A protein has these predicted regions:
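Surface beta-strand/loop "capping" patches
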Residues: 213-240, 595-635, 721-735, 849
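An acidic-aromatic loop/edge-strand motif
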Residues: 84-87, 92, 99-108, 157, ...
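Glycine/proline-rich low-complexity spacer/linker segments in large multi-domain proteins
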Residues: 2-26, 31-38, 153-154, 177-210, ...
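Beta-strand/loop-rich accessory regions of lumenal/periplasmic or secreted enzymes
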Residues: 87-89, 184, 278, 669-675, ...
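Extended acidic/polar, glycine-enriched regions
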Residues: 172-175, 237-308, 678-719
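Accessory beta-strand-rich segments of carbohydrate-active enzymes
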Residues: 3-18, 37-38, 52-58, 84-92, ...
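Extended substrate-binding grooves/exosites of carbohydrate-active enzymes
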Residues: 1-39, 88, 96, 151, ...
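Intrinsically disordered, low-complexity Pro/Gly/Ser/Thr-rich segments with frequent PxxP/GP/PP motifs
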Residues: 262-272, 645-675
Length: 1012
């Protein structure tokens, strides 16, 4: 064995590492730009770049001491550091959620453990004023051994934390060689079972810090906020004591406090009339720590986090976390994430009204927290702990009692793991303790509860009593034991139903309630943002939540022939153990293109809302949902009045004061037309430029219907009232068909289905295939559980059959009434249906469909008609909710308007294809080209979908780049669709959004036409 087996030894977590300390970057002189340009410090030597690399499928294949001085690496490959070796073509990709990718046999890992050998030559010049040298690895998965110039330096683990080694005595002036052996797994891998692609290597920065002999080693900044005074306390540790000059400056560079360190290593500085930090105004002071040969520049955010009466306050104000869970993930770089990539994420989050981030499920790179300080995000910092795997071990009795008991016993409540678990929490807290964006420490994720987490919580609360503690998995416990929860500050839940939240508030409510994960954003969804928002706002004990999750996780594998990126998820690399596309559950696509779910979130969490509007008096009442800013200081409000989707007036509202969490009134007197569908839309614009946000950025909108008594869309009404010509109809019947012919049209209805098989108008055939009654949709990710019931009911195989048909012909029209049903093999009749078609001499078709569902069947996915139209009908105009897709429980980001689009534009290209692109609350839709078209219209609003893909194709294909277009425009006119929800990892669709109707009636009109 080339190295000692520390990787399977819980008694050796680290060897020769420096004590954990706060993150900072020193320099020989004052440098104020090191948050985003730390490599410019003359005391930081970045070792990133091209390294020599050799991948071994087994540690036993390493025959040579590659780490020896002057070892010949000519036969080694090259790899970029930082990176993960799977993204460089070594090993295989694997995505797994809960299951360990190796046997559960702690502390042991597979004997033939894969590993990577890294070698890098670099030049080093000793600085006489900074003669000490410390080698830092900010992230290595999973554990590693390190040598310099052939001398063993040390060993460490905890993939997402910094490991620091004193290498002063092994470095030499001139050329040096660092060698690193990285193991794919170690005993620590049992604590790193996070829901993500499993990747390996040196994935964060590597650098040397040059330090004076007499220098600060660590410091802890604490603050106390009083009425008009802030006290800043510093506790400082040294490698060797030295004098320290301390100064604090405001954002304009004015010195507001001076001080020095006393003999105890402490200092207290006072700031009069302090500016407090919050997410809306992230004010930072600059802290300068100056010694004889070194300057450390840091920043301070003055803020106070506390819990009073089970309510969380920031600076004395009740707050709500508008948060999101964020993994380090990129389709090209894996979980090697640059500062630029983080900036992209933070910018998108600000643009979409987030104010908080959970570092799920491990600490991020240290500069991430500096950026959150700067840009105004509250953070839950989470330890690099997830031991979910024991939940999946074999149990003879698979009851909840036994499941939780066994889960707890294996790691959380086994004292042999105490040092490892507490170590990970300490490393996080020590490194990030000076980052004021962090308002809450999380002990980890989904690892059950026991004595080891009691110890971790106890240490954390004793060390840092000013921050909140959180650990959702505390609720998963061994019911035979009594545990201590006294150091846990909030009650956290993942994906609870609204009824479960209410039950806690009614029966317990002893701690603030935190939705640490909610509204699972997988595929088309979520559909319940608004409902959770209302629950959060209705009770002060509800402190908000963190949506799961920020981005889809996928691996990019080039471009398909159709130009689409080939994104791979679980199982696409041949791995046996995987969890499919469960990693595709973000608010943005892997490349950070925005999902419609993110648009939905943005408008649900808009800064203000209309409480009421009286169109007669013009009184407008708004509620300000900002926590700290008066609305007049943050938002400029414009308005638009539309009639049947067209803007008829618009202007800017005069500013008026609405205090945070308060309501305010103004007058907006507008002249509403006597007829038509009229809406008043208030648009909230950012009033001032902010970090990451431009002035006039749209923060959200409100829409209120202000129609008068004649509240019908005139465009829809015009088509529906189209008058018949004087020509008579010809009707011919046989055993299977009914032919209806007018001056400009010829239609055929199949007696066996009671539906159209031909629809010719002006000599053109509109239907490529027969019309269908449609109750199926390509299951969404959020349909993953109800889909089983739907398929058991054979909804996906359903078809229409007719029993009797009666034809009644008049002078200018014909009425065809059929008794029919929707049926499928092996099951009873799903729907009993009466279908009535009225066709007038102009070719207009009025439909009236009455349906009765057998009550034994589950909720329907949808009900409507599906037509396969001439593919040349590619241009769309519609009056309804748009421009993006919208559903009965997912339309907060859509608004009523008269929209134009191309059929291809309506497709939402989810990486795993599924139902998408529907438009809710429509009264009129027109598909056309330059010469002819067809209109669907109704008095009662409907949904429609126009796509180049059939629902069968969407269901069949597992990746978007595999989709093949139909020969038709697939046009669905729907009475209703079942809600979207978030049941992929959340509660079932709320009752009010379920399509559970037993009796329903769908009336609509179809009108083919030619232009001119």
């Amino acid at each position: 064995m080339i190295v000692p087996r520390y990787y399977e030894n819980l008694n050796v977590l680290h060897e020769n590492t420096m004590p954990a300390r706060a993150y900072y970057i020193p320099a020989s002189k004052r440098m104020d730009n090191l948050v985003e340009h730390r490599e410019e410090s003359d005391r930081m030597q970045l070792l990133n770049g091209t390294w020599k690399f050799q991948y071994f499928t087994s540690i036993y294949n390493i025959k040579d001491s590659f780490f020896e001085k002057n070892y010949d690496t000519e036969n080694f490959d090259e790899i970029q550091v930082p990176s993960v070796w799977q993204m460089a073509g070594y090993d295989t990709h694997q995505y797994t959620n809960i299951r360990y990718p190796f046997p559960f046999d702690p502390p042991y890992v597979p004997q033939d453990i894969p590993c990577g050998a890294y070698v890098h030559n670099f030049e080093y010049s000793r600085d006489e004023k900074a003669s000490k040298a410390f080698l830092n690895f900010e992230g290595v998965d999973s554990c590693f051994y390190v040598w310099i110039n052939g001398s063993y330096v040390g060993y460490s683990q905890v993939s997402h934390m910094t490991s620091e080694f004193d290498v002063t005595d092994v470095l030499q002036d001139g050329t040096n060689t660092v060698a690193v052996l990285v193991m794919k797994w170690c005993d620590g891998s049992y604590l790193e079972d996070q829901d993500k692609f499993r990747m390996s290597g040196i994935f964060r920065d590597v650098y040397i810090l040059k330090r004076p002999e007499q220098a600060i080693s660590d410091y802890h900044i604490k603050s106390k906020i009083e009425d008009i005074l802030a006290k800043v306390e510093l506790d400082v540790k040294f490698y060797s004591p030295t004098n320290v000059k301390i100064s604090i400056e405001d954002k304009n560079g004015a010195v507001v406090a001076l001080g020095s360190i006393d003999e105890e290593g402490t200092a207290v500085l006072e700031i009069a009339s302090p500016e407090l930090w919050n997410t809306e105004n992230p004010y930072l002071y600059k802290l300068i720590l100056e010694t004889e040969n070194e300057v450390i520049v840091d920043h301070i955010a003055l803020r106070k986090v506390e819990i009073k009466d089970q309510v969380i306050y920031l600076n004395g104000q009740k707050i709500k976390f508008r948060g999101v869970n964020r993994h380090d993930s990129d389709p090209v770089t894996g979980f090697t994430i640059s500062l630029e990539q983080i900036t992209t994420d933070l910018t998108l989050m600000k643009q979409h009204n987030f104010n908080a981030i959970r570092s799920s499920h491990y600490p991020n790179a240290p500069f991430f927290y500096e950026m959150c300080d700067k840009y105004g995000f509250m953070v839950i910092d989470e330890a690099d702990i997830e031991a979910h795997g024991p939940f999946m071990i074999y149990r003879k009795e698979d009851t909840d009692y036994n499941r939780f008991k066994r889960w707890n016993e294996k790691i959380a409540d086994d004292p042999v793991w105490e040092e490892a678990i507490v170590d990970r929490v300490k490393l996080m807290v020590e490194r990030d303790k000076n980052r004021f964006c962090i308002v809450m420490w999380s002990m980890g994720n989904e690892s059950a509860y026991g004595c080891n987490f009691e110890k971790a919580l106890e240490w954390t609360k004793n060390y840092d009593p000013d921050r909140i503690t959180q650990y959702e998995s505390a609720r998963y416990r061994n019911y035979d034991e009594t545990y201590d929860y006294s150091n846990l500050d909030v009650y956290s839940r993942m994906y609870p139903a609204l009824s479960e939240i209410q039950e806690y508030l009614d029966k317990d409510g002893s701690k603030p309630f935190l939705l640490v994960e909610y509204c699972h954003s997988m595929g088309n969804g979520p559909g319940d943002f608004e409902d959770y928002f209302q629950m959060i706002q209705d009770n002060d004990k509800m402190c908000g939540g963190f949506v799961w999750e920020w981005c889809d996780h996928a691996i990019a594998h080039g471009t398909a022939e159709n130009g689409k990126t080939i994104y791979a998820y679980g199982g696409d690399h041949g791995e046996e153990i995987h969890d499919g596309n469960f990693c595709m559950d973000g608010l943005v696509y892997p490349n950070r293109t925005v999902h419609t779910g993110l648009l939905e979130y943005k408008n649900v969490y808009r800064p203000a809302r209309v409480i009421s509007y009286d169109k007669e008096s013009g009184e407008l009442v708004l509620h300000n949902y900002m926590d700290f800013d008066d609305l007049k200081d943050y938002v400029k409000i414009s308005y638009e009045l539309t009639q049947d989707g067209l803007v008829i007036s618009k202007d800017i509202l005069s500013e008026f004061s609405v205090v945070p969490h308060g309501e305010g009134k103004t007058n907006l007197k507008i002249s509403v037309p006597e007829n038509g569908k009229c809406y008043l839309k208030l648009i909230y614009h950012l009033k001032k430029e902010l970090p990451l946000l431009d002035e006039d950025h749209i923060l959200g909108f409100d829409e209120s219907e202000v129609s008068k008594d004649d509240a019908k869309c005139k465009l829809a009404e015009k088509w529906m009232q189209k008058t018949a010509t004087d020509s008579e109809l010809q009707v011919n019947e046989d055993d299977t068909q009914i032919h209806i012919k007018g001056r400009e049209f010829a239609y055929t209805i199949d007696r066996r289905t009671a539906l159209f098989t031909e629809m010719k108008f002006a000599g053109r055939e509109y239907l490529n295939h027969p019309m269908e009654l449609n109750i199926w949709r390509a299951p969404t990710d959020n349909d993953m559980y109800i889909k089983a019931e739907w398929k058991k009911a054979h909804y996906d195989k359903a078809y229409t059959r007719a029993y009797t048909t009666e034809v009644v012909q008049g002078k200018h029209g014909v009425k065809i009434v059929s008794h029919a049903s929707v049926v499928a093999e092996t099951v009873q009749k799903i729907l009993d249906v009466t279908i009535t078609w009225k066709i007038d001499a102009s070719g207009k078709i009025d439909a009236d469909i009455e349906a009765t569902k057998d009550g034994e069947f589950p909720d329907l996915p949808r009900f409507g008609v599906r037509m396969f139209l001439d593919k040349k009908l590619a241009d769309i105009r519609y009056f309804g909710m748009g421009p993006q897709e919208s559903y009965r429980d997912k339309h907060q980001a859509a608004s009523h308007g008269l929209y134009r689009a191309n059929v291809g534009d309506l497709h939402e290209d989810y990486i795993r294809p599924q139902e998408n692109g529907s438009h809710y609350d429509c009264e009129y839709v027109e598909l056309n080209n330059s010469r002819y078209g067809i209109v669907a219209s109704a008095e009662k609003a409907f949904s429609f979908n126009a796509s180049y893909y059939t629902q069968e194709e969407l269901e069949k294909k597992t990746h978007n780049y595999e989709l093949i277009e139909s020969d038709s425009v697939v046009f669905c006119v729907d009475y209703a669709l079942n809600g979207i929800g978030s049941n992929s990892c959340g509660p079932v669709v709320l009752e009010q959004y379920r399509f559970d109707d037993v009796l329903f009636r769908f009336q609509f009109t179809l009108i083919p036409y030619v232009k001119g």
